[in-house]
Amino acid sequence: MDKDNQALDELPMMTGSKHANKRLFAAFMIFGLLNNVLYVIILSAALDLVSADTPKGVVALFNIFPALITKVVWPLLSNGKIRYTRRVGFCTICSWFGIITIALSSSLSPRLLGISLASLSSGMGELTFLQLTTTLPTEATSKTALGAWSSGTGFAGVAGAGIWWLLRGLGVKGGLGLSSFLPLFFPITYKYILPPFSHLEASSDSSPYQRLPTSSSLSNNNNFRPPAILISVPSSEYVPQHTPLLSSGFIDRDRDRNRDGEELTDGDKRLMGMRASRLTTQEKMKLLRPLVVRYMLPLCAVYVEEYVINSGVAPTLVFPLPTYGLWSWLFKSPRDYYPFWSLTYQTFVFLSRSSLSLGLPPIPKRLLPLPAIIQFLVLSLLFLQAKTFFFSSPAYTPPADGDGGVDRSITIVFLLICLEGLCGGSGYVNTFYHVGREGSSVSENYDADGENEMGGDRRTLNVTEMEKKAMEREFRIGAVGAADSTGILFASLISMPLEIALCRSQVDQGRTMCREL
């Protein structure tokens, strides 16, 4: 009978937990979509933002470089507790002001300033929300949040191109003016959709993060003795047993509230002041070094390869128009090829970035370089097609332009670009999944006898060390976030001369379609 009553008591908690998980997924999906959609809209609007004699690569450069600087520099310079609420507010204001500046300006310089502000917001947003996934109370909820974020960023590619396609008829002022309302959903989602973290804990049977005792647990258990908290210099005394311990659990998104959204008590703030942890520059460098080869180089390589394909090779993948079959319905003009390759790529990036959300297992850590290896193969084959028409039949190899029918290489290129999108999305979501798990288990910091490297016992793990471990997780995922932007920047420098060289090669062989677009 008691078991039945206990089951009935737990039923509302389980139902509430499932609802909280849905809110968590929706919130991070929206965060990912909002953070990347303006980036895509700006790239899609590049032709309308600059004059005909201005290289379109200027827009791409100003759209990525500020984000890269933010993601490289900020994790190294910032210190102490991350104030997530303030960061979300900064991203909202910066993104809105940037897009409004672009919309209301008619000359190049202020538009580039607006693009830079939007890029700065995008870089800070990715850094912030990836770090936020490491603060969730369980491994399962962190995985849910990361999967939703990745799905949102993947869908932003399709959504951004579609939004600008619908709004471009309104012009830059009207189309981007309407788009400026999108950043306002950041604070709305953060405040009203993202659930209190305490509602998420019943959703998982195990948690890699140790929860601090709450005031309610202390008051309801007279025999409970809170763990002694060792305070370093200037005092080596234990904190008295009656010292308040974070009255409602984990510290949430800034230092003034806990994860239930309640104001911290004066005792909580005093305790936080005594145990404030910071990562020194030396500690950050020590954390960063193993990440470079393990995570950053493979992710950077994937991004270099896929953006070289998108910006340097894909514009030259143009074929004689097919006269029958499915391709003849899609390609009515040579200008239709590049948008179709872009849509294909974005669609399969979205699918692969959603792999965790779809319940697919992550690839093992040792196989993280695999997407970059496959991507290099895809790049090589597409380069050969653009350079030598490697897959084309003799009837479609220049100087011949075919005599009706369909060039078989169109289908092969389509399949290769599908694989490109799958590799790019897989590299992103799996890299950040494994980075988020680095250092997530407190037990991994102890030897077989239960002692850590500082000589402490697992049973007396102090609050300062726990907070420092959390900061290390936030730093790791934030630092690795610079790898993708670095790859895009390198790719942009490679792509511009590569596209020119490939087009010149095609013209020399007798096919001038790339020049006529």
UniProtKB/Swiss-Prot annotation:
GO biological process: amino acid transport; regulation of intracellular pH
Primary localisation category: membrane
Keywords: Amino-acid transport, Membrane, Transmembrane, Transmembrane helix, Transport, Vacuole
Membrane-spanning parts: 24-44, 57-77, 88-108, 112-132, 146-166, 169-189, 371-391, 409-429
Membrane topology summary: Multi-pass membrane protein
Highest taxon of source: Eukaryota
InterPro entries recorded: Battenin_disease_Cln3, MFS_trans_sf
Localization: Vacuole membrane
GO cellular component, one term: cell tip
Recorded coiled-coil stretches: none
Family membership: Belongs to the battenin family.
Protein function: Involved in vacuolar transport and vacuole pH homeostasis. Also required for cytokinesis.
Protein name, per record: Protein BTN1
Species of the source: Cryptococcus neoformans var. neoformans serotype D (strain B-3501A) (Filobasidiella neoformans)
Gene: BTN1
